Structures are given as C-alpha cells and as structure tokens.
C-alpha cells in the first residue's frame, strides 16, 4: 500500500474511532486514538500482520479492539497511556518553552511594531500619535502595567521623555526599519530599568508586581506540594512491589489478587513518579535561577543608588547599561513566573490519571495483602547489595563499568530507565531499580543495571533472550514503551519529547584518558639559613657593629655645585621614513669597430704593399 493511501486509511480509522467514542459519551483526542491504534497493532495477541495490507475485516476488528480499550475507563493501563500522551503534548523543557514564549510575544507585538516602523508622519498631530504608539509599545513589551491605566501611562511617558523626547522623532523616522526596531527594544529596556529603580526608591513603579517576593513564596510552596505527592507515590510503589513479591511465592494469593492488574497499577504509579521528578527538577532549576537573579537585581539597584545619589545629571554611559541589565533580569524573572505556573498546571492535570488505585486496591485490601510482607524502599534495596560486585574476570567477552574506572559514570543512559532487566523478564514485568554499584553491563553499545549480583550473572549468560522478553512484554503493555524508554525499538511510537532529546542516546563511557606526572626537584622548601654564623668572634664583631650604630647620626652634604644640578631632558625630532632616488641609468648603442688589413702575406713584388681598410660605420648611422 502506498504511503499516502496508508495515511488516508489510518486517518479514516482514527476519525471513525473518535466518532464511536463520542457516541458512547467519551471524548478522546486524536493523538490518544493514534497511539492506541499503533498499540493494538503491535500487540501480537491481536494477530495483525504489519507487512500485509489491512482488509475490511481487519479494519473492523482494529476499530473494535481500540474501542474496547478506550472505553475501559477503569483500567490502570489506559490511565497510564492517557497520562503519557497528555504529558508529551504539554511538557516542554525550559529552554525550548522560553524560546517559544518569546517567539509568541514577538508575533503579538508584530502589528504594533509595524505601525511604528512603517509610519511616515510629518504633521504635528501625526507625530504625537506616533509617540503615543511608542509609549503603548513600551508598555506592552515590558509587561509592566496596562496601556489603559492612566497612572501607568503617565509614568512611562515621563520616563520615555527623559531619554527620548518627542523632538527626536524626526531623527527616528530617518532610520532604517531594523535600526528602528533595535532602538525601540533599547528604549523599552531603559524605560523599564528607570521604572524599576523609581519603584525601589519609592517614587513610582505603578502596576509593577514584586516578582522576587512572589516567586520566593510560590516556588517553595510548589516544591513542597510536589515533594509530598512524590513521597506518597513512592510509598505506594513500595507497597505494590512488596505485595507482588509476596504473591510470587503464594499461588492462592495470586489467584485472588490478579497480579497483572496490580502490575499495571505499578506501571501507572511509576510513570507518575517519573513525571513528578521531571517537573520537580525543572522547578529546582528555576529556584536556583531566581535566587541568583535576585542577588544580581539588588546589586544593580545598589550600584545605581551609589552612581546617582543626589546628582542632578549623570552621564548616560554610566546609567543606561545598568538600566538595561535591570530590565533583562526582570524579564528573566517574568519568564520564571510563567514557567512555574505552567509546571504547576501540568502537575495538577496529571493527578486525575491515578483514579483507578483507590477503586481496585482500597486501603483495607492493601493492608490485608501486606500482612507478613516486608516493604522495602529503593534505597534499602540498593544498600542490601552495595558490597556485591561483579567479578570482571568471570566475563572475558563482556565489558563491565564501575564508578572508579569511568569518568562519566553518572551520565550514562541506562536501559529500561535504570530498572533491572533480568528481574523484569524473569518475573513477568516486576519493576525493581538496578544498582549501578554492582556494575553496569555494556552490551552492543547499551548499558544495563541489575538489582543483585545473581541477576547480573544470569542476564550476562544470554542477554538477547532477556531483551527479547522485555520487548514482547512491551508489545502487550504499550505503556511500557515510554516508561522503560524503548523508543528505539518501536520507532513508530517515539514521542515528540524523546525525538528532541535524541542526542542523549549516544553518550559513551569515558574509561581512558591521557595523563602525565612529574616529580618536583625539591618537594620541601630549602631550610638553609644564609645568615647563620658558627664563629663566635664573627658574632661578637656584628654585635659591636650594631652597638656602635646607636651612637651614629646620619648627615647629608651638599657642595656649591651639586645644589645646582637638576634633572635634564632633551627633545629630538622623531624618526621618519625617507627615501632617495639616484639618476636613472641609460645606455647607448655605439658602432662596433671593423678594420681590415690586406697584403700582409706579400706577393710577387719584393716590396710588401699593405692596405688598411676601415669599414666602421659612423655614429650617426647607427
């Protein structure tokens, strides 16, 4: 089937399932339906062949299976999938969220910015209207007050006129569009800095909230609430795990308990724990940023007070950079306020996905099943096997990593989110945290941890067997794909948040590094005393000399000539580059002498008659 035709079929299936769910009174998002369709197709028990074209009967069966799972509202597995889909669609890391937030603000200010930069005002009324638009722009961009508040507008107008009077609009209109936008941003930051300084001095700040005080109250309260929920979730995890471990050795308890349902509840609460840890980590990062920015804000305000004091005029080069820094810090505080609000809202909206716990596992039943069981925390489980370590000599073909031999040991991406792969495969889905101190197995560029030494040895005997078991289990319980981070094995179900963090899957362990050592020539400082004297008479001589110095007086002498001497200075012309040019060389072509002699050999006559012929050409002929 061509890709376009397959997409059309999938869209029609999703639309049909959505309509059927709505007819049964259940409103389901298309994202959740699409995820459920892929989950049903992946489950081998449903009998769908991925390499074969779906027939009409297959489509009807697929719709029926999806409807059954989506309408089973009291199923922990469905709640986990809903939680995962909601979190993936609504969570963004801090950096990307703030970038998107700033982009949205810029787009909202686009129309106001264009009205200012494209303005061609000439008349007085038009210039006044343009100036009012600039005031509105400054207010909207800074987010400190409403443009409809008269007091706020007056305060902004006064601050703007002190740095950008209306008379300078003519110069502003001659600038290019980019320069206008840049100047508008600078004016906004300077005006914001002036208002913040006036607010700190008690002379203004109309409509400006005390963001540091608000954040110092909101962040600890949010962290405390999330911490409480996180501890409650972990307590529930430990109790579920203890009951499942007890049921593994008690057939009667297994028949009564329905372990598969309890395991789905365990996956649900474990996923909730993971999401709470992500949210809490972001809030802790925000708290650290707020603390640092609050200190910087106070330092800048104090610097401004020391610079201005009671002066009537201060150079702009001294105060404008501080005003801009104040504005930047305040904008960052505004960003932190929004981030905390979004994270708190996300935390509130994932809590309803835990509703099935009280329904299927009430407190009374839990206490009855826990009778005689030992509830262990994750930390306790790790401490039990802290001293048990894998012996590398037992494995010649496998590589094991340990904290003392791996530089980035804590940064390695552990498979299955750090849970023990052997325990999960051997117990049909029980989640126990792995202990990295036992040793991390590196197998095909992936890293695995185990909760005990025996589990590590068992997994190392046949890793592929246990990896296949985990993969098949994830096909039946699709929520495990995101919980155990199996996205690379099921690329069709990779969530958007995992696609953005794809680079983190390629962190390699650092087990070797270049190093060098050098021995100091003298480790200890020298102890030789140069002024030491062993001769008694030399010591006596120095003592007499020092005693005589007490009776001496320092004198100065000046002659008749020396008092006239003074420091002298001379001045010369600085060197400069010069050049000379000689007469140019020339040449002339003189004729070559050509003189011939005849009759030197003599002849019949007794007298030799010598003839000299000069054939040299004249100078003017050359």
From Swiss-Prot:
Chain segments carrying region Disordered: 571-592
Keywords of this entry: Cell projection, Cilium, Cilium biogenesis/degradation, Cytoplasm, Cytoskeleton
Q: What does this protein do?
A: Essential for sperm motility and is involved in the regulation of the beating frequency of motile cilia on the epithelial cells of the respiratory tract. Required for the establishment of radial spokes in sperm flagella.
| Keyword Nucleus in annotation | no
Q: Where in the cell is it found?
A: Cytoplasm, Cytoskeleton, Cilium axoneme; Cytoplasm, Cytoskeleton, Cilium basal body
Task: Give a GO biological-process term.
Answer: axoneme assembly
Q: Which GO cellular component term is one of those annotated?
A: radial spoke
Query: Which cysteines in this chain are paired by disulphide bridges?
Result: none
The lineage's top-level taxon is Eukaryota
- Family (UniProt): Belongs to the CFAP206 family.
Name of the featured protein = Cilia- and flagella-associated protein 206
């Amino acid at each position: 089937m061509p890709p376009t035709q397959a997409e059309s079929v999938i869209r029609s299936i999703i639309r049909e399932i959505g309509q059927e769910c709505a007819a049964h009174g259940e409103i389901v998002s298309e994202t959740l339906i699409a995820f459920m369709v892929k989950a049903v197709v992946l489950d081998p028990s449903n009998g769908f062949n991925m390499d074969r074209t779906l027939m009409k009967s297959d489509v009807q069966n697929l719709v029926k299976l999806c409807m059954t799972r989506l309408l089973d509202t009291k199923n922990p597995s469905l709640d986990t999938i809903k939680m995962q889909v909601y979190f993936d669609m609504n969570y963004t890391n801090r950096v990307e969220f703030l970038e998107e937030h700033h982009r949205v603000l810029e787009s909202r200010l686009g129309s106001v910015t264009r009205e200012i930069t494209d303005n061609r005002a000439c008349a007085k009324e038009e210039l006044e209207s343009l100036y009012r638009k600039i005031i509105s722009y400054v207010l909207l961009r800074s987010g400190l007050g409403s443009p409809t508040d008269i007091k706020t507008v007056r305060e902004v107008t006064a601050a703007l006129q002190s740095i950008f009077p209306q008379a300078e609009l003519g110069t502003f209109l001659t600038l290019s569009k980019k320069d206008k936008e840049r100047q508008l941003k600078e004016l906004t930051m300077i005006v914001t800095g002036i208002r913040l300084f006036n607010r700190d001095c008690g002379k203004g700040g109309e409509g400006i909230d005390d963001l540091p005080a608000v954040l110092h109250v909101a962040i600890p309260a949010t962290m405390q609430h999330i911490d409480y929920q996180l501890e409650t979730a972990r307590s529930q995890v430990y109790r579920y795990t203890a009951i499942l471990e007890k049921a593994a050795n008690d057939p009667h308890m297994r028949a009564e308990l329905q372990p598969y349902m309890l395991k789905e509840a365990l996956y649900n609460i474990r996923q909730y724990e993971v999401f709470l840890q992500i949210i809490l980590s972001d809030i802790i990062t925000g708290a650290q940023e707020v603390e640092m920015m609050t200190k910087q804000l106070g330092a800048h305000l104090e610097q401004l007070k020391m610079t201005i004091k009671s002066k009537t005029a201060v150079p702009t080069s001294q105060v404008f950079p501080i005003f801009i820094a104040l504005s930047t810090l305040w904008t960052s505080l505004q960003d932190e306020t929004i981030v905390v609000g979004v994270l708190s809202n996300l935390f509130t909206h994932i809590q309803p996905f835990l509703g099935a716990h009280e329904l299927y596992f009430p407190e009374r039943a839990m206490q009855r099943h826990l009778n005689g069981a030992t509830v262990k925390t994750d930390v306790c489980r790790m401490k039990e096997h802290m001293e048990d370590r894998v012996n590398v000599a037992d494995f010649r073909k496998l590589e094991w990593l340990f904290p003392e031999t791996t530089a980035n040991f804590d940064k390695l991406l552990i498979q299955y989110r750090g849970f023990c792969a052997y325990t999960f495969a051997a117990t049909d889905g029980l989640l126990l945290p792995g202990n990295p101190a036992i040793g991390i197995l590196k197998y095909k560029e992936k890293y695995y941890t185990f909760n005990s030494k025996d589990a590590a040895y068992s997994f190392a005997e046949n890793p592929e067997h246990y990896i296949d078991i985990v993969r098949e289990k994830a096909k039946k319980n699709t929520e495990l794909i995101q919980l155990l981070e199996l996205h690379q094995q099921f690329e069709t179900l990779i969530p958007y948040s995992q696609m953005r963090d794809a680079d983190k899957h390629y962190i390699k362990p650092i087990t070797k590094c270049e190093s060098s050592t050098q021995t100091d020539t003298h480790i200890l400082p020298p102890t030789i005393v140069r002024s030491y004297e062993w001769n008694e008479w030399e010591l006596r001589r120095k003592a007499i000399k020092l005693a005589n110095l007490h009776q001496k007086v320092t004198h100065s002498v000046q002659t008749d000539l020396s008092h006239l001497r003074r420091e002298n200075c001379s001045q010369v012309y600085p060197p400069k580059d010069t050049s000379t040019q000689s007469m140019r060389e020339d040449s002339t072509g003189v004729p070559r002498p050509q003189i011939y002699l005849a009759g030197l050999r003599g002849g019949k006559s007794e007298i030799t008659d010598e003839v000299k012929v000069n054939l040299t050409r004249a100078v003017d002929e050359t």
